Amino acid sequence: MSNHSNAAAVRAFRILEILSAADGPLSLAAIVQAIELPKQTVHRILKQLESTWLVSRTAGNRHYECSSRVRQLAVNVLMQAGPAAARHAILQQLVDKIGETCNLTMLSGDDVVYLDRVETQWPLRMHLQPGSRVPLHCTASGKLLLAFLPSAQRQRLVASLPLRAHSAHTITNAEALHAELAETRQRRLGVNNQENLEGMIAVAVPVMRNRSRACAAIAVQVPMARMTMDQLMGFVPDLRLAADEMVKTFCE
């Protein structure tokens, strides 16, 4: 690769880094200021990134963000990276103690994606594989990850969600969801009380990279035929201990 090609690749990667670290879509001017390159150069790189589906524009066409292709790439890397075995071991220890399915999840676009999952041995269970996606507004992990987004990004994302009813208990009103998210953030605990599937409950705790941002969530789900919500809440301290261990794998 020539020095010119190498420099162009580094600049393109730097722009992707800036977009991925931002709280929301960025304007051309904001990207120029962050990367300290001429406006024409940044605009040319952005057009190249758009043409390869690595960057997309928002509805107003004035702001840029990482595309769904980049988000899926990030998920794939995390699922296959070196610390994946350590993450799986942490989930396995939780399942051994609780006896129910445990998940490691993260936000990907307007969905929750499973980075890893250890299934219970009980025959009555939900069969989902790592890489599976579930809604944000009616899952314990989804509400938790939404709750820890910066306010503007959270408002924008909630406004874009269809808020479809998955059961009689699903929150389908944006105002009610925002109230739930405020409570979720305060208690640092996501709760799914039959909101995604009748008869299935779940709780989730954040994996915190710093005091205000959750990089992932750990959740346990169980049929109500085997456990009440009060009984499930009794395992929250175990989930929090697991989250403290899990965050170390995101720093490697």
Curated annotation (Swiss-Prot):
Which part of the chain is the HTH iclR-type domain? 6-68
Transcription keyword on record: yes
Cross-referenced Pfam families, in alphabetical order? HTH_IclR (PF09339), IclR_C (PF01614)
Which InterPro entries does this one have?
A: GAF-like_dom_sf, HTH_MetabolicPath_Reg, Tscrpt_reg_IclR_C, Tscrpt_reg_IclR_N, WH-like_DNA-bd_sf, WH_DNA-bd_sf
Give me any GO biological process, just one: negative regulation of DNA-templated transcription
| Residues of the DNA-binding region | 28-47
Which Gene Ontology MF annotations are present? DNA binding; DNA-binding transcription factor activity
Q: Can the keyword DNA-binding be found in this entry's annotation?
A: yes
Domain IclR-ED, first and last residues per copy = 83-252
UniProt keyword annotations, A-Z: DNA-binding, Transcription, Transcription regulation
What does the UniProt function comment say about this protein?
A: May regulate transcription of the sauSTU operon.
This protein is called Probable transcriptional regulator SauR
Q: Origin organism of this chain?
A: Cupriavidus necator (strain ATCC 17699 / DSM 428 / KCTC 22496 / NCIMB 10442 / H16 / Stanier 337) (Ralstonia eutropha)
The gene for this chain is sauR
